[in-house]
């Protein structure tokens, strides 16, 4: 029999210890992975609710199982809030992840073998934008576009490739690009060749919701996003459109269910509904502006200390530190910073001579530190410590000193105060 007082601590101490250790790690480490964030206790409450028990194949009002009257309310709340947040006329909140949302778009709009123009992974794109190791690169004919010598997206090259190869779909969006994307220009190019414009805004969705980064929804035929990252919601995906095309909406819905998924995760959809409501609050706009301010503050210190930033700066939440020419790989930098309780990720940079498992760069993002309450002063101080380690990565005394400083800073800014 099930009882309300059942808990993990008493039943499964090994698992409980791992959860405790992860909780402590999050409190005592500074999180700078650009795709990570801290979700609110309200989102976690929704994810831990009885909604996890309910199967709900189909869509609100059109389910294959009975007993869905209340989960219909939950999903409808999430849909309507997502539409309001991004100015969309269509939203599907069922994708289990951003990659599955992207997969559904491919399935809805293309046939295997169709030509797709997507951002080169080595220049800041994402696996699902055409990497040879991903379904997108295996099933479709991918033509990659990239950045110019200044580190900015090369729209002239994009247009030339589009006219030459006539892709059926163009993809905008990125996983490691610190600039502003000209969505209107991309739509202009897509219209010139009669292609779909699909934008994956996963990394900047929170900034877009807050109005501090341009919104692709008015320009693209279809937009996808994760619901974590800058949106600070549960791990999951969403598909949006403002195309006012019911046939397109039906294709997208069918591509999610039954095309790629079975039953939706109703407890996660409830978490999405909470996160979308939080993102509609005025304080969310303040938070997102601070995310950008903190990123700019970090770039300022990196440049002062002689470090190269791809594209020379940032206009969003992330930056890519280029270590080419230094006696330090991205992998080594990642490990050295990790020893001081600073979590980043190694990342390839444009024209990287090293393998993706070693790399010549690190990617850094500010959503999580800003969520803790860091402002420009803390961001600059932290960047100075990072540079101290990168300057002398094999010196254990420097790492130990910075670790102590990190622990003190974390104690001042608890994740869940």
From Swiss-Prot:
- Residues the UniProt record annotates as site (Plays an important role in substrate specificity): 228
**EC number(s) stated in the UniProt entry for this protein:** 2.1.2.1
Q: Where are the transmembrane segments?
A: none
Protein name per UniProt: Serine hydroxymethyltransferase
Q: Name one GO cellular component term.
A: cytosol
- Keywords, comma-separated and alphabetical: Amino-acid biosynthesis, Cytoplasm, One-carbon metabolism, Pyridoxal phosphate, Transferase
Q: What species is given as this protein's source?
A: Shewanella baltica (strain OS195)
Q: Report the record's Gene Ontology biological process terms.
A: glycine biosynthetic process from serine; tetrahydrofolate interconversion
């Amino acid at each position: 029999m099930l009882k309300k007082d059942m808990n993990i601590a008493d039943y499964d101490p090994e698992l409980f210890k791992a959860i405790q250790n992860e909780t402590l790690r999050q409190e005592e480490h500074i999180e700078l992975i650009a795709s990570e964030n801290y979700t609110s206790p309200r989102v976690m409450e929704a994810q831990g609710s009885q909604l996890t028990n309910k199967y709900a194949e189909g869509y609100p009002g059109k389910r294959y199982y009975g007993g869905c009257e209340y989960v219909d309310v939950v999903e409808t709340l999430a849909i309507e809030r997502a539409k309001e947040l991004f100015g969309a006329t269509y939203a599907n909140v069922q994708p289990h992840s951003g990659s599955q949302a992207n997969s559904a778009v491919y399935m809805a709009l293309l046939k295997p073998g169709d030509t797709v123009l997507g951002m080169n992974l080595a220049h800041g794109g994402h696996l699902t934008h055409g990497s040879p190791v991903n379904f997108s690169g295996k099933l479709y004919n991918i033509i990659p576009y990239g950045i110019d010598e200044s580190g900015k997206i090369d729209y002239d090259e994009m247009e030339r490739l589009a006219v030459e190869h006539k892709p059926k779909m163009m993809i905008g969006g990125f996983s490691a690009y610190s600039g502003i994307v000209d969505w209107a220009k991309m739509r202009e190019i897509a219209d010139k060749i009669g292609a779909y414009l699909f934008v994956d805004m996963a990394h900047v969705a929170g900034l877009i919701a807050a109005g501090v980064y341009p919104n692709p929804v008015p320009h693209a035929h279809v937009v996808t996003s994760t619901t974590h990252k800058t949106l600070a919601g549960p791990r999951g995906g969403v598909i949006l459109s403002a195309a006012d095309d019911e046939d397109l909406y039906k294709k997208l819905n069918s591509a999610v269910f039954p095309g790629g998924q079975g039953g939706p995760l109703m407890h996660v959809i409830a978490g999405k509904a909470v996160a979308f409501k939080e993102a509609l609050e005025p304080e969310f706009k303040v938070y997102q502006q601070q995310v950008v301010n903190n990123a700019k503050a970090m770039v300022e210190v990196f440049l002062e200390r002689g470090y190269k930033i791809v594209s020379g700066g940032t206009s969003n939440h992330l930056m890519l530190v280029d270590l080419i020419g230094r006696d330090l790989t991205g992998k080594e930098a990642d490990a050295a910073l990790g020893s001081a309780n600073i979590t980043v990720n190694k990342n390839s940079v444009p024209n990287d001579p090293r393998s993706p498992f070693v790399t010549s760069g690190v990617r850094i993002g500010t959503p999580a530190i800003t969520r803790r309450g860091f402002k420009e002063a803390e961001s600059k101080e932290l960047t100075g410590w990072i540079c101290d380690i990168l300057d002398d990565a094999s010196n254990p005394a420097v790492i130990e000193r910075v670790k102590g400083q990190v622990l003190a800073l974390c104690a001042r800014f608890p994740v869940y105060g």
